[in-house]
Structures are given as structure tokens and as C-alpha cells.
């Protein structure tokens, strides 16, 4: 399963808000 990021939150610790891409080695949206 591929995890996509929301490009809305700049404070998102797992995604780059500027590029809307997941940061390397980050696990988000698991159990949310």
C-alpha cells in the first residue's frame, strides 16, 4: 500500500509540504 501525503500541513512530520512527498523512513497514517 502506498501512502500519500496531504499537501496542506506544513507541520506534518512525515511529509514535505512543499513537494507533497513522504520523507524517507517515515511511518505515518498508521493507526490514525
UniProtKB/Swiss-Prot annotation:
Monomer. Keywords: Disulfide bond, Hydrolase, Secreted, Toxin. Transmembrane segments: none annotated. This is Zinc metalloproteinase/disintegrin-like CdtV1. Disulfide bonds join 5-14, 7-15. InterPro entries: Disintegrin_dom (IPR001762), Disintegrin_dom_sf (IPR036436). GO terms for molecular function: hydrolase activity; toxin activity. Expressed by the venom gland. It comes from the Eukaryota. Snake venom metalloproteinase that impairs hemostasis in the envenomed animal. It is found in: Secreted. Belongs to the venom metalloproteinase (M12B) family. P-II subfamily. P-IIa sub-subfamily. GO terms for cellular component: extracellular region. It comes from Crotalus durissus terrificus (South American rattlesnake).
